[in-house]
């Protein structure tokens, strides 16, 4: 990356790979109204992009050649002046993943430590000479005299890291093996990005440019996201046991300027001193990852100076009842990201106040239903006798597992489904010791189950050395802060409180015009979706499953679905006491079996595996028509355990989220609690899954346009065994369905609210004698039930079919399938790009011959209009200003809150409840009608006879 300073009209230009970005201070908008000027109080900067010309030959631009620039941190405003922050010194310290080529390790990606950062003013050239002529004396002046000196000193302290090709803000299990800027922007964890505030406006600007220019911007490699903490890779070259171990510690910014303060929780559940530490081990064939987190105790307390030896003591400011809300919010956030959370409290009570804190912590944890383990040993005792710690944490370590990826097969065969949340007070050493010992134990347990890799002495030495260095850097960071807390709080306030607005009228206009022309490059189309669920009882069958995958309505090639989503339960028999509870062979077997069917001999349509993942015995597979694959993006998954209170993989859910062009889909397969009487447990499983499954940027299940939720829900029929079997023979399915537990739960609005299930006209799918069509004849004589279900939600979905396959007999369940038609919105990216180019060319024709100020004035004119496209009307751009004009507040009296007798949305004396003059013993609601009562349907009556 190169940097130029514009001298005639002060500007900063960065250039890389034939692409330039120019930043220039905007004092006022030419032609703006007084109201716009009054509202535009946020300091503004104009940004322009253009192809790289030979700036060095232009006398207006001076290239800064005193150092090598490595990336853009963003824009910062201090005391009304704006500066461009760029990285000017780095060191390569890590490569989490690599390949062995010709017996040599070749890094697949790199992590860099930031050594120096420079700040270039958009206001004047006062400090330019210090930046253009490097010397120790000038560096000292930049630290002590430059307005951004404290920020420069902060970013240059050796604790900031970034990567161009590795999503450094997320743990390995949360990102794929492929990497690009689009992925990073969409999926990064902003709580660990220290320059998120500085780069936010550049990211917003990027969202407005065309896809073609986005690619140029990405290739230039300007945008850089930095984390703070510690990162390093150690390579152990030992023949077949060649391996690398990478440690990545990320200090959270969730508390902003109080990030490193010694204090408790905030009302919204944020804590200080929160650090996520991940170990990544890479071998020639496998990648392992394990994550732990530590932070301040999530309660309301403050530290006060003590006259005793220990220096500080704790004062609890709120009891467990008052603190419970914030405590719950903190752990809800952790659960949504990491899965099951187990507390490891390592504070040894030394006083009455610490004893009170420990009791309050215990009360809140028990109220929330979170396991808490108290470790009262010192760091030296733990180091000498690690078994004392590991014995107490053994169950959690086994149950949470570790992330594991088979490089040669290209499959994930284990996932970490929980995390240890370590709590400490005024200490970095003890949490680091606990994490080091747990990390070592996890690696030993994991590698014991992998035949091709063993832990060697050099590897374990490297592991311990990395943890020692991790402690040194984190302790150094914390100690520096505590020694001068007030100073650092001011620096963090500048970093997180800076506000700058980027102004680019050209791209704003193009973006707005494209929105108005949306109908010219978007269209709606129908795609077909096959959804199938099957509990296979741990079998690896040789039986043909063609009747399930290709029902009669899809038996011909031109009738095949565009998307196949397959959910399987009990694909493996789980063995307790294993770190890696997923058998990769089973997943490969089913992927190959189904893909072979879809791509049968003579078929012109070709299908590919779009995505798959497994949680214990639950497997979710997605296959898509190859011609539609290019329209799918932003694929990501999540898992949630519910078995044994969330501590085992025998029950739970696997979910995937993806966008088909502009329509967002979510597919889930789940296995809920078994047993006739366990309705409440199944309901709790549903609530846990619905609450815990989250995707990037906090996206939840309900936030999607179309949702398909299927699996072995284990709901039973509340009738006697004899009555159920008799009604099955006479095909009285409607009568059975009335007593179905899931049906009753949905009618009551308890489980799966807003979901729809098509009328069932097939016999119960559980439980059979395997290999026969006979319902259970064993000693238990289980009551037949519709345990296997498929539900849907979303206006874009229309269900066409809901059946089971009665002739696939190898399991004690029967496979169930549903066929949907989905109305999706498709964006023709090529046509959109063409239109964007046309708009750009027409605007540039109007601006030809004008200088920069005149161009901004023209584009800021409300009357600016460009000619029509393809017969459409002329298009006028909306009024633009760096800050949007807020709508005036209108005083409006709100109605009183609702009660049992009156609802605020029902007026004029109308009753809250409506009594229908229908005899429920004779009539029932017509199941063929749309579940939404406001959808008109003249063909079907509202009620029908039973």
Swiss-Prot record:
GO terms for molecular function: inositol-1,4,5-trisphosphate 5-phosphatase activity; phosphatidylinositol-3,5-bisphosphate 5-phosphatase activity; phosphatidylinositol-4,5-bisphosphate 5-phosphatase activity. Coiled coil: none annotated. Keywords: Cytoplasm, Cytoskeleton, Endocytosis, Hydrolase, Lipid metabolism, Protein transport, Transport. Residues 151-480 form the SAC domain. It catalyses: a 1,2-diacyl-sn-glycero-3-phospho-(1D-myo-inositol-4,5-bisphosphate) + H2O = a 1,2-diacyl-sn-glycero-3-phospho-(1D-myo-inositol 4-phosphate) + phosphate. Residues 936-946 have a biased composition (Acidic residues). SMART domains: IPPc. Belongs to the synaptojanin family. Present with 98 molecules/cell in log phase SD medium. Interacts with IRS4 and TAX4. This is Phosphatidylinositol 4,5-bisphosphate 5-phosphatase INP51. The gene is INP51.
């Amino acid at each position: 990356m190169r940097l130029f300073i514009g001298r005639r009209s002060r500007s900063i230009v960065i250039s890389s790979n034939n692409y330039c970005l120019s930043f220039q201070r905007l004092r006022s908008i030419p032609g703006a109204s007084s109201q716009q000027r009054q509202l535009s109080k946020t300091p503004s900067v104009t940004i322009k992009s253009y192809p790289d010309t030979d700036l060095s030959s232009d006398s207006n631009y001076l290239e800064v050649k005193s150092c090598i620039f490595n990336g853009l941190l963003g824009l910062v405003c201090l005391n009304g002046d704006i500066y461009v922050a760029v990285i000017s010194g780095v060191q390569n310290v890590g490569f989490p993943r690599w390949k062995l080529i010709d017996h040599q390790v070749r890094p697949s990606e790199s992590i860099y430590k930031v050594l120096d950062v420079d700040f270039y003013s958009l206001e004047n050239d006062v400090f330019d000479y210090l930046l253009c002529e490097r010397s120790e004396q000038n560096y000292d002046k930049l630290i002590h005299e430059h307005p951004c000196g404290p920020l420069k000193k902060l970013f240059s302290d050796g604790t900031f890291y970034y990567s161009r090709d590795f999503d450094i803000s997320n743990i390995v299990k949360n990102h794929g093996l492929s990497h690009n800027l689009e992925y990073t922007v969409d999926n990064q964890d902003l709580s660990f990005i220290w320059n998120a505030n500085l780069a936010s406006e550049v990211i917003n600007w990027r969202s407005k440019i065309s896809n073609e220019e986005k690619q140029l911007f990405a290739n230039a490699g300007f945008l850089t996201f930095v984390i703070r903490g510690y990162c390093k890779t150690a390579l152990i070259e030992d023949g077949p046991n060649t391996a690398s171990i990478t440690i990545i510690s990320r200090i959270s910014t969730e508390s902003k300027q109080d990030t490193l303060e010694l204090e408790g929780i905030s009302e919204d559940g944020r804590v200080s001193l929160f650090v996520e530490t991940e170990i990544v081990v890479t071998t020639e064939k496998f990648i392992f990852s394990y994550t732990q987190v530590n932070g301040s105790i999530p309660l309301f307390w403050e530290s006060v100076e003590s006259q005793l030896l220990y220096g500080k003591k704790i004062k609890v400011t709120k009891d467990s009842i008052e603190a419970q809300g914030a405590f719950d919010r903190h752990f809800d956030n952790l659960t949504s990201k990491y899965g099951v959370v187990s507390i490891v409290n390592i504070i040894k009570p030394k006083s009455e106040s610490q004893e009170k804190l420990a009791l309050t912590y215990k009360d809140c944890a028990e109220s929330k239903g979170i396991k808490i383990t108290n470790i009262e040993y010192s760091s030296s005792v733990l180091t000498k006798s690690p078994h004392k710690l590991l014995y107490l944490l053994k169950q959690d370590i086994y149950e949470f597992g570790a992330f594991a990826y088979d490089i040669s097969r290209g499959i994930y065969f284990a996932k970490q489904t929980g995390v240890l949340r370590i709590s400490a007070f005024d200490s970095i050493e003890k949490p680091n010791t606990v994490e080091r010992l747990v990390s070592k134990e996890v690696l030993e347990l994991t590698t014991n189950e992998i035949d091709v890799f063993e832990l060697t002495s050099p590897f374990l030495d490297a592991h311990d050395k990395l943890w020692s260095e991790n402690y040194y850097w984190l302790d150094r960071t914390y100690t520096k802060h505590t020694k001068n807390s007030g100073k650092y709080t001011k620096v963090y306030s500048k970093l997180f409180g800076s506000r700058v607005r980027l102004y680019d009228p050209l791209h704003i206009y193009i973006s707005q015009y494209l929105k108005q022309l949306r109908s010219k490059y978007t269209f709606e189309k129908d795609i077909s979706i096959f959804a199938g669920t099957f509990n296979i009882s741990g079998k690896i069958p040789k039986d043909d499953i063609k009747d399930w995958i290709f029902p009669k309505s899809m038996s011909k090639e031109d009738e095949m679905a565009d998307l196949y989503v397959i959910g399987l339960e009990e694909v493996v028999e789980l063995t307790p006491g294993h770190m890696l509870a997923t058998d990769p062979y089973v997943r490969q077997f089913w992927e190959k079996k189904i893909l072979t069917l879809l791509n049968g001999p003579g078929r012109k349509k070709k299908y590919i595996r779009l995505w798959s993942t497994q949680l214990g015995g639950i497997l979710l597979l997605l296959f898509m028509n190859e011609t539609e694959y290019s329209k799918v993006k932003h694929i990501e998954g999540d898992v949630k355990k519910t078995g044994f209170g969330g501590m085992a993989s025998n029950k739970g859910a696997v979910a995937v989220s993806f966008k088909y062009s502009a329509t967002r889909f979510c597919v889930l397969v789940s296995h809920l609690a078994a047993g006739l009487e366990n309705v409440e447990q199944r309901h709790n499983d549903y609530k846990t899954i619905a609450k815990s499954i989250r995707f990037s940027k906090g996206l939840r299940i309900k936030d999607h346009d179309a949702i398909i939720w299927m699996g072995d829900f284990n709901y039973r029929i509340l009738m006697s065994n004899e009555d159920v079997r008799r009604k099955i023979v006479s095909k009285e399915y409607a009568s059975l369905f009335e007593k179905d537990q899931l049906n009753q739960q949905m009618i009551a609005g308890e489980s799966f609210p807003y979901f729809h299930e098509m009328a069932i006209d097939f016999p119960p799918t559980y439980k059979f004698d395997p290999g026969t069509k006979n319902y259970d004849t064993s000693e238990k004589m289980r009551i037949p039930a519709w345990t296997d279900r498929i539900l849907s939600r979303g206006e874009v979905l229309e269900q066409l079919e809901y059946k089971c396959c009665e002739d696939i007999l190898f399991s004690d369940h029967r496979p169930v399938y549903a066929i949907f038609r989905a109305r999706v919105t498709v964006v023709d990216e090529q046509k959109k790009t063409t239109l964007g180019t046309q708009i750009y060319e027409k605007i540039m024709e109007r601006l030809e011959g004008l200088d920069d100020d005149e161009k901004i004035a023209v584009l800021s004119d409300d009357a600016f209009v460009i000619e029509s496209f393809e017969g459409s009307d002329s298009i006028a751009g909306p009024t633009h200003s760096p800050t949007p004009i807020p709508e005036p507040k209108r005083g409006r009296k709100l109605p009183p809150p609702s009660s049992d007798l009156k609802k605020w949305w029902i007026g004029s004396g109308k009753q809250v409840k409506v009594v229908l003059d229908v005899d429920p013993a004779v009539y029932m609601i017509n199941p063929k009608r749309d579940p939404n009562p406001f959808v008109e349907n003249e063909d079907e009556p509202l009620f029908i006879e039973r």
